[in-house]
């Protein structure tokens, strides 16, 4: 992990993508749904010049479609050895249609988890 870049920019299926650990410009802070608006997320995509922003850091899943594209956080499979919360989730983002499927390791196989909005 040490050798991975802090940020990555590229394209998949004709869609421009920006990935970072936290939020663009600051990998020590994350995007929490109750602290961000769709307008702010749309502005982030516009300022980055991308269709898709993939983030992490919070260990909580996030999927938001906005006018410009979408913002995704798949959550985390990591288990902490303290009281910190983690989601035990991972996700699959399909491009170019920007659909996102979230999988939860704590839910029995075959059971659906609630979709993110």
List the model feature ranges, each with a label.
Residues 25-26, 42-46, 62-66, 72-74:
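N-terminal start-of-chain detector that recognizes signal peptides
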Residues 19-20, 51-57, 71-75:
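Active-site neighborhood of phospho(di)ester-bond hydrolases with catalytic His/Asp-centered motifs
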Residues 25-27, 52-65, 79-82:
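Active-site environment of divalent metal-dependent phosphoester hydrolases
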Residues 1-52:
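Conserved catalytic scaffold of divalent metal-dependent phosphoesterases
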Residues 5-9, 60-61, 88-90:
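Short, acidic/polar N-cap/turn motifs at the starts of alpha helices
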Residues 64-117:
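Acidic, His/Gly-rich catalytic cores of divalent-metal-dependent hydrolytic chemistry
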Residues 1-3, 55-57, 84-86:
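Short solvent-exposed loop/turn micro-motifs enriched in small/polar/acidic residues
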